Amino acid sequence: DKVGVLYIAFEEVVEFFTECSVYSSDGWGVKWYGSDGTTMSAGLIAYTTAAAFSYTTGFINPIFSPTQSDKWQKVHDEVQNVLGRAPDSYTYVAYDIVWVLALSLLEADAHDSGAVRAVLPTVAQNYFGASGWIVLDENGDRASADYDLWIIDKLDTTYEWKYVGKYVQATDSIIWGTPPP
């Protein structure tokens, strides 16, 4: 209970888990954690061996959770309408990046990267976008964020992604919807 595996990857997780299952069907009895690069991987549920390994290990995957608001809903509905599918969480972030940059250009009143860089943190801090409030740390990264937690669940002979909870940064806690196995 004091050892776990953090696997940060993208679609190569399918091949890695398929190979791992050759040596241990239960992941050596330790908890496995993924990243936003593995969350909602279509390959992980399409390939039965990798899906079974994910399911058996309780492979938990976090992904940025935008604040749901009227702005969030507007972007969600527009993307759904145009693409025929719901946007992923980083769609809201990309939308906000464009707006913060545009507003920073207007605030700086110059097309000078130094002038834009000087005003961007303040512009971001005062902007509530489709992803929520944007407060940056000293490195220019988002200072805080919540994360949705997903696992792979088994349905008869197939697998699907299942939302199980949310990490809430403000309280440094997890609110479980359905606790993982």
Model-identified regions with their sequence ranges:
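Hydrophobic alpha-helical
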Residues: 3-24, 100
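Short, glycine-/Ser/Thr-/acidic-enriched flexible segments
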Residues: 11-12, 39, 154-157
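Segments of small-molecule ligand-sensing domains
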Residues: 78-91, 102-163
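Short, cationic low-complexity segments
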Residues: 162-181
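Extracellular/periplasmic periplasmic-binding protein-like sensory domains
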Residues: 17-95, 106, 153, 174-180
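A general structural motif
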Residues: 1-2, 29
